[in-house]
Swiss-Prot record:
GO terms for cellular component: cytosol. The lineage of its organism: Bacteria, Bacillati, Bacillota, Bacilli, Lactobacillales. Signal peptide: none annotated. Belongs to the NAD-dependent glycerol-3-phosphate dehydrogenase family. It comes from Streptococcus uberis (strain ATCC BAA-854 / 0140J). HAMAP family: NAD_Glyc3P_dehydrog. GO terms for molecular function: glycerol-3-phosphate dehydrogenase [NAD(P)+] activity; NAD binding. This is Glycerol-3-phosphate dehydrogenase [NAD(P)+]. Sn-glycerol 3-phosphate binds at K108, G139, S141, K194, D247, S257, R258, N259. GO terms for biological process: carbohydrate metabolic process; glycerol-3-phosphate biosynthetic process; glycerol-3-phosphate catabolic process; glycerophospholipid metabolic process; phospholipid biosynthetic process. SUPFAM superfamilies: 6-phosphogluconate dehydrogenase C-terminal domain-like, NAD(P)-binding Rossmann-fold domains.
Length: 338
């Protein structure tokens, strides 16, 4: 498959990296964003230095601030915008798009307020006559590695297997490979909730704890992610795959992860507002912590790590006290599902 036209909504680090993958596969790629300065840089200098200091983007990759131009004749649309603006952008797409396309998203979060997964948000705003079933593109992937063509394996999840296979063929090449999955709930919740655990793992590092503690929070984090996901209707096997444990490992152990770095800074005593300002990028794990905590409280799901991070971020509890407080929780079996 080649020479498809793909509109990528969001010229951030991951949107730019995915644009290069698609360009390498012979597709026409148009990045859409709202910063004229950034769009001009991509078109004129073929760089995106806010995210990649020393990377040159192929000159065939185009960028625009005009949504109508980006969507014109597109075969597929990929949302890679922050969770909090996904609904707004989806509304704009619905108002602008004039033909049916394959629709994908590669963002990882849950919408604040509604608690909805992003495929649901997009489906609510874009009528069915303009789109396929949403395909979720998710898995263990640092943009910094994908942009230099390091080997990356992720998941294309959709209730429509043919749409998932289309996306699989669209992206896959010698360094980037997709596997299909029909469990959209599992893939989306895994991608969103692992950011919370990454904040916790980073906080342990910032506090000076070693590998034992980090392994514990990642492993028990996977357990509580799975508990909540299954309660929401996910297949538990999904959490042992690329979009589950794979994404949790890459996000919960690496300095490339903005959520891990945010947790590390919290552990070292920095204030959240300073962290967000210094990073200059959206830290999805912060808002997702609140959403996940609220869902867990509503459904009665035991999520001690999420609760500890929530209390630290939103109730002013010390991060060290919150995390160490889990050590005095009631004894439990490792395999409890509630």
């Amino acid at each position: 498959m080649s020479n498809e036209k793909i509109a990528i909504l969001g010229p951030g680090s991951w949107g730019t990296a995915l644009a290069q993958v698609l360009n390498d596969n012979g597709h026409q790629v148009c990045l859409w964003g709202d910063s004229q300065e950034q769009i001009d840089e991509i078109n004129q200098k073929h760089t995106n230095t806010r995210y990649f200091k020393d990377i040159v983007i192929d000159e065939k990759i185009k960028a625009t601030t005009d949504l109508k131009e980006a969507l014109k004749d597109a075969n597929a649309i990929l949302f890679v915008v922050p969770t909090k603006v996904t609904r707004l952008v989806a509304k704009q797409v619905a108002e602008t798009l004039d033909h049916k396309v394959i629709m994908m998203h590669a963002s990882k979060g849950l919408e604040p307020g509604t608690h909805e997964r992003l495929s649901t948000v997009i489906s609510e705003e874009v009528p069915a006559e303009l789109r396929s079933e949403i395909v979720v593109v998710s898995g263990p992937s640092h943009a910094e590695e994908t942009i230099v063509r390091d080997i990356t394996l992720i998941t294309a999840a959709s209730r429509d297997l043919e749409a998932a296979k289309y996306v699989q063929a669209l992206f896959s090449n010698h360094y980037f490979r997709l596997y299909t999955n029909s469990d959209v709930i599992g893939v989306e919740t895994a991608g969103a909730l692992k950011n919370i655990i990454a904040v916790g793992a980073g906080a342990l590092h910032g506090l000076g704890y070693g590998d034992n503690a980090k392994a514990a929070v990642i492993t028990r984090g996977l357990a509580e992610i799975t508990r909540l996901g299954v309660k929401l209707g996910a297949d538990p096997l999904t959490y042992s795959g690329l979009s589950g444990v794979g994404d949790l490992i890459v996000t919960g152990t690496s300095v490339h992860s903005r959520n891990w770095r945010a947790g590390d800074a919290l552990g070292r005593g920095e204030k959240l507002e300073d962290i967000e300002r210094n990073m200059g990028m959206v830290i999805e794990g912060i808002s997702t912590t609140k959403v996940a905590y609220e869902i867990a409280q509503e459904l009665g799901v035991y999520m001690p790590i999420t609760t500890a991070i929530y209390k630290s971020i939103y109730e002013g509890a010390g991060i060290k006290e919150s995390i160490l407080g889990m050590m005095s929780n009631e004894f439990r079996s490792e395999n409890e599902w509630h």
